Design a protein with these regions (language model features):
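N-terminal low-complexity, Pro/Thr/Ser-rich intrinsically disordered segments
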Residues: 42-60
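Catalytic loop of the DD-peptidase/beta-lactamase superfamily, centered on the K-T-G motif
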Residues: 520-528, 533, 539-540
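Bacterial N-terminal signal peptides that target proteins for export
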Residues: 4-17
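Short, P/G- and charge-enriched loop/turn segments at secondary-structure junctions
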Residues: 55-57, 87-90, 491, 521-526
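Bacterial N-terminal signal peptides
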Residues: 16-24
């Protein structure tokens, strides 16, 4: 009797196991999904006969040269310490940032010199029509001068001397930093296309002013790349079944997004690197600096007492005593001199402050958006010619902008596609945006009120600046000669803020420790360069948030 009972119990325990195994076998017999078969139509993808072609083998975005992946998340943007300066321009707000990439270090003199060398070789400044392309990209080395300082050695040597090769570039204004970023995008993608066989070997060394590479042109008007030479000697080995050259497309997944300046929220998020104080889904405390300490000196046993950034320590003290240099430098120091933060980024506090993409306003308007916050959107589209094709910038039709300080800068390099602001064709009956230029969006000016009519009515009332919230000085924009320069001497200006002032973040070798806090924000006109502001690049991440999709207990 007992034996039969035990047998029944054992059989009952076995039943679920058999059922599970049977279920697994049935599931395994189901039809497998073929990645090269459309789940919409059942047609073949990437068939030799033709039809829809798509990169079904794409795994993950390639990490561009010099970049580090910053996994996105939520954080408190703004000052969490006492506002001793009473600026009231960085009130804490909760923001979320998408994953992105950022340069491991600031852009160095050597990196910028590579840019200048390329411009000089492709657009020789001794030829009149190209002169302003090269000259407009030159950093302002005179930023080192001071009426009561002997700094002429820095004026002559800092940019070009190999002793400063790995030091951060300075004397670069915001506009120049943006243009370097665009140039870098094209050079990186050009190398990728050559590596993957879409361009001829060493094609990038055979360019001149009439045959340069542009990522935008390659994607949208590929036959016009290299001034139309891509169909000949510049083309790669990849061909279709007819023997014609093939081009990489957005669907190929091999070209990288653009290098650009980071937004303010990206820069601050990356600088704070809160992963180091995270446990599971909560933060254990808060950070005052990019490192996990309330002090500017190391608390680790091996390096205890060492400074963790390059900054001004006191009046007349930029580096300590001879033989016992506190921060290893008087001015800037080589990148990677100090330990990185928890994201692996160097010099996010000290050395040089850094330009970010945003137009400055005292308030970060989290009521409008708390996701990828950015003030500065100006939406553009490709210019279309009379023949219905996109217009490619040539040496003959390149346009130049004259900045407020008289510096002349090329708007687009030859080989790029010309752009114009979007118009009613793109904004008609839209809810998410209504204008091309959104730099002053919802900043308290007349267009932000319920009585706002339309932009044309405002312009008809008088000057375009009459109704602006921030009534900044407007110096006369210089002409082609020095006599065209003039200052705004009116007495009714109330602010230095306008749509051409940009945020810069972080402390520098000239700043006291207060400015090392990543939440601090300052601004300057985008045409101004200094001896303490540099920059680094960022890049958007496409696809998944992280390379590894599993959670970790600690950052």
């Amino acid at each position: 009797m007992l034996t039969s009972v035990f047998t029944m119990k054992r059989n009952l325990l076995k039943v679920p196991v058999y059922m599970v195994l049977a279920g697994l076998l049935l599931a395994g017999c189901g039809k497998k999904t073929d990645k090269n078969t459309s789940s919409a139509t059942g047609w073949k993808i990437n068939a030799k006969e033709g039809g829809f072609q798509y990169n079904t083998d794409f795994k993950d975005q390639e990490t561009g040269p010099g970049l580090v992946l910053i996994e996105g998340g939520t954080f408190t943007m703004g000052q969490v310490e006492d506002d001793i300066m009473h600026d009231w321009n960085n009130t804490p707000t909760q923001q979320h940032v998408q994953s992105f990439y950022m340069d491991e270090t600031e852009v160095t003199n050597k990196m910028y010199m590579e840019y200048l060398d390329w411009l000089k070789r492709v657009f020789p400044p001794d030829e009149e029509q190209y002169r302003n392309i090269y000259i407009g990209a030159l950093p302002d080395t005179l930023v080192w001068r001071s009426p009561l300082s002997a700094n002429e050695a820095m004026v002559s040597n800092y940019l070009r001397h190999p002793a400063y090769a790995e030091y951060p570039v300075v004397g670069v204004n915001w506009v120049q930093a943006v243009q370097f970023s665009s140039w870098r995008t094209d050079r990186v993608n050009e190398a990728i296309l050559e590596r993957d066989g879409y361009l001829a070997k060493d094609a990038r060394y055979q360019v001149d002013a009439t045959s340069t590479f542009s990522t935008d042109t390659y994607l949208n008007a590929p036959s016009q790349t290299y001034g139309g030479k891509i169909a000949g000697e510049m083309g790669g080995k990849k061909t279709n079944k007819e023997g014609e050259a093939t081009y990489a497309k957005q669907t190929s997944g091999i070209l990288l997004p653009e290098y650009r300046l980071p937004t303010e929220v990206e820069w601050e998020y990356a600088a704070k690197s809160l992963g180091g104080i995270r446990e599971y889904n909560s933060l254990q405390g808060r950070k005052k600096y990019p490192w996990d300490s309330q002090y500017t000196r190391s608390t680790k046993r091996r390096t205890r007492g060492d400074l963790l950034a390059n900054f001004k320590q006191g009046k007349g003290d930029y580096g300590g005593l001879a033989g016992w240099s506190d921060d290893k430098g008087d001015i800037t120091v080589a990148v990677k001199t100090y330990p990185p933060n928890d994201f692996g980024l160097y010099d996010m506090a000290g050395n040089v402050a850094e330009w970010v993409a945003d137009v400055y306003r005292p308030i970060v308007d989290d009521e409008i958006t708390d996701f990828n916050y950015y003030r500065g959107n100006v939406y553009m589209k490709h210019a279309i010619g009379e023949d219905g094709k996109q217009i490619v910038v040539t040496p003959e039709n390149v346009k130049y902008d004259t900045l407020m300080n008289g510096k002349i800068i090329a708007r687009n390099l030859p080989g790029n596609l010309a752009t114009v602001p979007i118009d009613s064709n793109e904004t008609y009956l839209r809810y998410n945006f209504t204008h091309s230029d959104n730099r002053s969006y919802h900043d308290g000016d007349k267009s932000s009120t319920r009585n706002y009519r339309n932009q044309n009515d405002l312009m008809a009332e008088g000057s375009e600046y009459t109704n602006s919230m921030y009534n900044a000085p407007r110096p006369k924009r210089p002409g082609s000669d020095i006599s065209g320069k003039g200052y705004d001497t009116s007495n009714d200006r109330t602010s230095l803020i306008d749509d051409e002032v940009r945020v810069y973040k972080g402390g520098s070798w000239r700043d006291r420790a207060y400015w090392l806090d990543p939440a601090q924000r300052r601004f300057l006109p985008q045409y101004i360069a200094t001896d303490y502001i540099g920059f680094r690049n960022a890049m958007s991440r496409v696809g998944s948030k992280a390379k590894k999709n599993h959670k970790t207990p600690k950052g």
